[in-house]
């Protein structure tokens, strides 16, 4: 059971982590050893680079995640998952239950066929 304040604590922790990350990015932009020149104008400060760096980091993270999970969304992986699920959980059902599953599937397909425009769903598509 979760405590009532857990959600707000998790959100505040996330905000704190984002703030620390922004500080780290800003400090890395200054370079090692400090900077002896006067601080730049507020519009051109290293803080103005944080949104761009965050966007670049998030885009690369999303791209890498999408590429690494691309195999999962392919038809072979999904078909394998469904086949394994059927073998593990549905293969030993009784004939009455299997007949009910088939009739439910047929009913669902008929409803989908009735909702589909005739121009898009020809009879040969459903055979």
UniProtKB/Swiss-Prot annotation:
It holds the Pfam family APOC4. The keyword Ribosomal protein does not apply. It comes from the Eukaryota. Keywords: Lipid transport, Secreted, Signal, Transport. Its main location: secreted. GO terms for cellular component: high-density lipoprotein particle; very-low-density lipoprotein particle. It is found in: Secreted. Residues 1-27 form the signal peptide. The keyword Cytoplasm does not apply. One of its GO terms (biological process) is lipid transport. May participate in lipoprotein metabolism. PANTHER family: APOLIPOPROTEIN C-IV. Belongs to the apolipoprotein C4 family. This is Apolipoprotein C-IV. It comes from Orcinus orca. The lineage of its organism: Eukaryota, Metazoa, Chordata, Craniata, Vertebrata.
